[in-house]
């Protein structure tokens, strides 16, 4: 995590190994981030399932279940299941 002071992570969030969280990220609710993901910068994820190998940049993901290896962004706003 390059700049931990610029990241907000709620207590119920789970993050896998070898995942990078970039500045300006907000992780809320029961969000699950898998292994080897790249999250941020400037991403908000709430109550979502982000499996292994996903990349998300400059986007908002709410109540969404992504597919393994998904690439999202920039400027996407996703809600509901894929």
Task: Name each model feature, range by range.
Residues 1-12:
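Long, charged amphipathic helices and adjacent flexible linkers at domain junctions
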């Amino acid at each position: 995590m390059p700049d931990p002071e610029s990241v907000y992570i709620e207590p119920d969030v789970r993050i896998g190994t070898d995942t990078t969280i970039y500045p300006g990220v907000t992780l809320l609710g029961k969000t699950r981030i898998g292994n080897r993901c790249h999250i941020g910068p400037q991403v908000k994820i709430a109550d979502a399932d982000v499996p292994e190998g996903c990349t998300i940049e400059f986007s908002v993901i709410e109540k969404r279940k992504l597919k393994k290896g998904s690439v999202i962004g920039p400027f996407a706003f996703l809600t509901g299941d894929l």
